[in-house]
Every structure is written in structure tokens, then in C-alpha cells.
């Protein structure tokens, strides 16, 4: 007995399944498979904006870390609001914000002597003011984002932030920064 199957029906079914896959797979992949570069949840009350922060955004590179395709955001920043405070007393958090979305990424300190040499007149320990953060673009909605850095004191909890002149742009295919 021969089964008669319409070729157009089979092609329609295959195309429908492919479309469903490409629509629903990226969020499922991001939620269940990515372990690095995930935005964190923090309480973000009204913070004082300050200009008492020296900073530079050095780059946004694509990297593969633990088998995951990520972006590494890196640069340096330190507060000059209270020169008696140690820089290590502050936790730094990367904020990327658009009109409709806001994401927070913890910044990891990286040792470096070049900032210490450049700002030797401040008499501060600046050896760990370099930072980097892993960012998985699959968690970020397409759009144009402003970049901010939050400084949160580890002991007394006071916080302030510096808005940078850097824009982060998330397109459907990539993440870029414009300075």
C-alpha cells in the first residue's frame, strides 16, 4: 500500500518548525545553558550622581570563556570623592540603561600598575582599579544603552554612580561600544 503525502505540506511543516526553533531557542538557550555574563539583580534606589570618579572604558572584546561566547567589557575606574577611603572598600557595578531596560553586571578587579603610575600624586593605592565584566548579549534586548558605574561601599553601604560618555549598542547580532 502506497501512502500519498503532499510535498507542499511536508515543506510547510519543516519551514514552520524551523521558524518556531529560531524564535524560541535563543531565550531557552540563554536561560538554561549560559552560566557566565548573566545580569545580576540589585536594589537600585535613587543614587547620587557624582563627577568625583576617574574612569576609562578601554574596550569590549568577544571571548570564549568556559565554552560560552561572551563579551568582556574592561577599563578602569576609581572614586576621588573621599581620598581617605581605600578603593578596595568599594564594590563596583556596571550599569547599562536604556529608556526601557536596565541591566547590572558585577565588575571584577584586575591588578595593574599603570594607573598607579599615572596618578602617583594622589597617594592612593590604585593597583586594583582596573575592572572587567563578562556580558552575554543574549540577555540584553536590542537598543542603545548608556553606561554607568556604581560605587557601593562594602562596609557602610553608601552608593553613588558616575554616568560615562560611552554608549553600548546591542544589535540583533552583536554588542558594540561608541565613545
Predicted feature descriptions by range:
Residues 7-179:
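Basic, ligand-binding patches in group-transfer machinery
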Residues 1-5:
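N-terminal secretory signal peptides that target proteins for export/translocation
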